[in-house]
């Protein structure tokens, strides 16, 4: 008896077969019409109206018209009521000429389907009118046990719910995992250290993304406290964003991400754990509370189904299984709930007769609470004389790192996370931040210690002097393989952060971080030059101007 109501944007030919499109290999003949034409203004008005309608209890159920459009949203909701009757003639269209099946399956993110009690319909329609949102009754939920679709007063579609929801047999897939052969640290090839440091900053995955980011508005409603770029020139990277949600409250939210697909070449488990740690690490680096955070997972995978054209499908599926286990284990360790997610399992294309597949990739996006946005911490160094501390042990892994890609040869095992240890460290750091002890904080990710050091110096337009002999290491660092400077500067061991502290706060800082793996590795300087020493001698000195030019990819290095 509930009415099926569609709210939001009108239906068009865009977004037809979008779900099918995302599950097939791309080619030169893939239809552009499968991609939805976004309308963010319509979507925003619809979402605000729905929140108000929810608070007033004007609907009993809601789902989006994403993959599959009305066929999916109303078909899913019909599983609760026991059936649905859909009238395609009532559906508002962008233009005439759509076939009934096109109206039924066109998908969009700015359309939603509601279940509305008839007695509340008038109030819902009036609210939608006042909020300038189109709302239309397009059917009725029934007990027929079927999805009935009508167009031009004629029944054009009829499916039993049992077939719709359970009619497709479950696939029986084979996953085959071959663990990589354990190997000790691989000797680092000789290189021009200074040149390598600049090339790391110019590498496409490390270099500035300002040209892209500035195309988007990150000042909406003046709520952004920490923006994508920070520092005196507003051109150094942040570890994420901090937003003030309500003007009258100091509480805010952080938004961070974690993604490291190259680590997955050897093991999807390690990749997933490192992605979670990177998102959590960025949240904590901004001043976020590690006890208050949530995340969503986005899996982007090459076809994991074995077949004649996909002989390694069983391994790709095993990587997916490993990644799911790594994600689950890391989230449990951090008490991190996954509140949403998405997957795309057919990221393959044929271009000029050649098959191209993406790497197995997991993106973790995190939103958490920062108790006081006034205590938010940014990556840029603040003043000469501030003391530099490196938190977390460096284990010297170079596999899958930016440096390995520049070296052009395998450099051993990739990074692996230890979430339980990291969580203890993050709690201690957060307590120190709440006390106002931390001046700057930057997580170590792509490019390792060197990239973090260079970016923080660039942000403050201040130099730094560090001693690699002081870097906290574990027995796994691989010092016996030589080239220690490269290993310590460029390894991407997770759960590490670069922190600056005022000299007068040193005692408070050490008390707050008692028992944590950390070491004082240097200090901030006024000479706009980053100096690195090892074994009692200077191994590199690079000026801020050179760092800026390299990081902004003026003549940068391709990925």
Residue spans of the language-model regions?
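Glycine/proline-enriched, intrinsically flexible loops and inter-domain linkers
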Residues: 2-559
